Amino acid sequence: MHLMYYLNDEGKRVYTLKKVSPDGRVTKSSHPARFSPDDKYSRQRYTLKKRFHVLLTQLPAKPY
């Protein structure tokens, strides 16, 4: 059993253990993808995040 989710009418995630939502759509896995040290595309992901300013070091600091 894996935790799954689907989006409701308001766009919020609804978590479930079922493979199909009540309206008949297939649910998505709520778990992140596995980490692999042999990741061939990490450089491309890093470059895209840097280009669009979404790296954690490029974001403004959170107020505490």
Swiss-Prot record:
Example GO biological process: rRNA pseudouridine synthesis
UniProt cross-references to Gene3D superfamilies, sorted A to Z: 4.10.80.300
Keywords, A to Z, come to: Nucleus, Ribonucleoprotein, Ribosome biogenesis, rRNA processing
- Where is this protein primarily located? nucleus
Question: Which compartments is it annotated to reside in?
Answer: Nucleus, Nucleolus
Q: Which SUPFAM superfamilies match?
A: Nop10-like SnoRNP (SSF144210)
Note the Pfam families from the entry. Answer: Nop10p
Single GO MF annotation: telomerase RNA binding
Q: Name one GO cellular component term.
A: box H/ACA snoRNP complex
Is the Nucleotide-binding keyword given for this protein? no
Q: How does it assemble?
A: Component of the small nucleolar ribonucleoprotein particles containing H/ACA-type snoRNAs (H/ACA snoRNPs).
Q: Write out the function statement from the record.
A: Non-catalytic component of the H/ACA small nucleolar ribonucleoprotein (H/ACA snoRNP), which catalyzes pseudouridylation of rRNA and is required for ribosome biogenesis. This involves the isomerization of uridine such that the ribose is subsequently attached to C5, instead of the normal N1. Pseudouridine ('psi') residues may serve to stabilize the conformation of rRNAs. The H/ACA snoRNP complex also mediates pseudouridylation of other types of RNAs. The H/ACA snoRNP complex mediates pseudouridylation at position 93 in U2 snRNA.
The record's similarity note reads:
Belongs to the NOP10 family.
Q: What is this protein called?
A: H/ACA ribonucleoprotein complex subunit nop10
